[in-house]
Amino acid sequence: MSMTPREIVHELNRHIIGQDDAKRAVAIALRNRWRRMQLPEELRVEVTPKNILMIGPTGVGKTEIARRLAKLANAPFIKVEATKFTEVGYVGRDVESIIRDLADAAIKLLREQEIVKVRHRAEDAAEDRILDALLPPARVGFNEDPAQSNDSNTRQLFRKRLREGQLDDKEIEIEINEAVGVDISAPPGMEEMTNQLQSLFANMGKGKTKSRKLKVKEALKLVREEEAGRLVNDEELKVKALEAVEQHGIVFIDEIDKVAKRGNSGGVDVSREGVQRDLLPLIEGCTVNTKLGMVKTDHILFIASGAFHLSKPSDLVPELQGRLPIRVELKALSPQDFERILTEPHASLTEQYRELLKTEGLKIEFKPDGIKRLAEIAWQVNEKTENIGARRLHTLLERLLEEVSFSAGDLAISPDAAPIEIDADYVNSHLGDLAENEDLSRYIL
């Protein structure tokens, strides 16, 4: 990650409106990963990541920041919900499975990167195998150079036709590695054992091939994947993945507020305080056994987030609060924010609906006054009923364009027809009554 904090924030601004404090905190944390790697070895070991706690109502961008961060980081990243885990000893997943999933994510990420590096060699090898199936190699004569014989004019002609896609529909018989897939169902919390059994059965069937009749296009894809897999060194990959997890891994824990003990409620709750206590060693730094070997979590960055509607950050156990030193508060959305969300982000909601209906030959145009009125209604409904943030816009837009979407094929008469204008009057006629009637909006919007 060589992007500066300013560049990271600029990239996040393309998709997320507002919440500058959260973006800055995340950008600095991400950049500090790179800064740490530039330090001398003895100092690098001492620098631990400053974990982040994002606090804010639902639908304001907490999860979206995590999603976009995953794409920017180019590092092992996993997003989990705190509610899915239970205390060790109870039925369900324990928190150590987070690190095992992170290890899987690292292997997948690095394998994809390695396959990109060997792509050209894999394509050449795949082409040769397809050509061998199309044109069995000629028998080498006395005093004849084998390379010359194999690279005959006919073979070169077929190679050219193969690359141009002229042979895509031709059927060939080719030897393909036989995949030994075994579906194993196991109760929650036993995923590790399931994975080990699946790996065992997969290794037992390794190297077995099966003759299949396929079209050239399908065969080329399968053979290319096979050849790329052969060129990737699995042992090297595991070593690199282990380092990537330990030094660059990022874990995003959503819904952390749901495992906070609310107020002074008594009684034992397996899914709450126990989960928090299990998270402590993970965030502080411990060793977890994974398929890559023993993974140290000392330098993994943890970002936790929660709405904290029914509980407060102070309801988390004190030790966990101390391990999330950076606090960022995300603000509730204003009507102006809703207006910007509808138009500014890359692939905004209005653009998505416009392009979806264009596939039917129907043009729609969102007018500025229509967008403004839609934003006002979204804010009003959120204030009167439950505040679900930007997710309210999805509900409103579906309701607003329901009739147009249903009749799109009939309405698209000619390419030159004037677009349907979504202005303030159109919005009021379709949503005005629902927005004004609190009882109706509570159930429908």
Swiss-Prot record:
GO process terms (BP): protein unfolding; proteolysis involved in protein catabolic process
Record Pfam families: AAA, AAA_2
InterPro entries attached to this UniProt entry: AAA+_ATPase, ATP-dep_Clp_protease_ClpX, ATPase_AAA_core, Clp_ATPase_C, HslU, P-loop_NTPase
Entry's localization field: Cytoplasm
SMART domains: AAA (SM00382), ClpB_D2-small (SM01086)
Superkingdom assignment: Bacteria
Keyword line: ATP-binding, Chaperone, Cytoplasm, Nucleotide-binding
Binding site for ATP: I17, G59, V60, G61, K62, T63, E64, D254, E319, R391
Keyword Chaperone: yes
SUPFAM superfamilies per UniProt: P-loop containing nucleoside triphosphate hydrolases
A single GO cellular-component term on record: HslUV protease complex
Molecular function GO terms recorded: ATP binding; ATP hydrolysis activity; peptidase activity; proteasome-activating activity
Function: ATPase subunit of a proteasome-like degradation complex; this subunit has chaperone activity. The binding of ATP and its subsequent hydrolysis by HslU are essential for unfolding of protein substrates subsequently hydrolyzed by HslV. HslU recognizes the N-terminal part of its protein substrates and unfolds these before they are guided to HslV for hydrolysis.
Entry-linked NCBIfam families: hslU (TIGR00390), PRK05201.1 (NF003544)
Subunit structure: A double ring-shaped homohexamer of HslV is capped on each side by a ring-shaped HslU homohexamer. The assembly of the HslU/HslV complex is dependent on binding of ATP.
Record family assignment: Belongs to the ClpX chaperone family. HslU subfamily.
Protein name: ATP-dependent protease ATPase subunit HslU
